[in-house]
Amino acid sequence: DRSSGQRPSSGAKQKPAVAPQTAGSGWQLPDGTWQYLVIHHSGTQSGSVQSIHRQHQQRKEADGTAWLGIAYHFVIGNGDGMRDGEVQATFRWQQQLHGAHAGNALFNARGIGICLIGNFEETAPSNQQLDALKKLVTQLAARYQIPRRQVIGHSAVRSTQCPGRLFPLRKIQEAVPQA
């Protein structure tokens, strides 16, 4: 689930929220390949882009290759580590790299990974998180023409409880206008 490579240079680059530790090998994600929005919870009570990045840097592929860092494209805070409802884009989004969030090659390559801080098996996301997520999902779905049926929870692509039983996925999907 690692990613390597860079987006072709087509303008000014923004400074990543967290820069990867390893250089890419030239793999590129063509424009227009985003087809899914994959929603996750961190499974923790607190967290930030930086803390998840450090944790994910410790992970390795089956062949021993280290991950570049944070697996997601966006993180939404809950007030413990990041402001409640704060949305941060990670280096994967800023450089248009595929994710390492889904445990499935297709959904890593074609899915935008969005992680909300919290464990939604135990507590529901905050209203601020849900408002921020609805806004983000609506904007991304419109920009990349992603239909609401392709706004999914992580559990749709891998056997997991993520994003948790208390996560209101249907409400998020309904925020995306019908095509």
Residue ranges and their predicted role:
Residues Q96-G103:
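Flexible, surface-exposed loop/gating regions in the mature catalytic domains
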Residues H40, C115-L116:
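Conserved beta-strand segments of the P-loop GTPase G domain that flank and frequently precede/overlap
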Residues T65, N104-A105:
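Short, charge-rich binding segments
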Residues S25-Q95:
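Short, conserved "active-site rim" segments that organize catalytic pockets and cofactor/ligand binding
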Residues D1-W34, N78-G81, E86-A89, W93, ...:
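Basic/polar, cationic surfaces and motifs that engage anionic cell-wall
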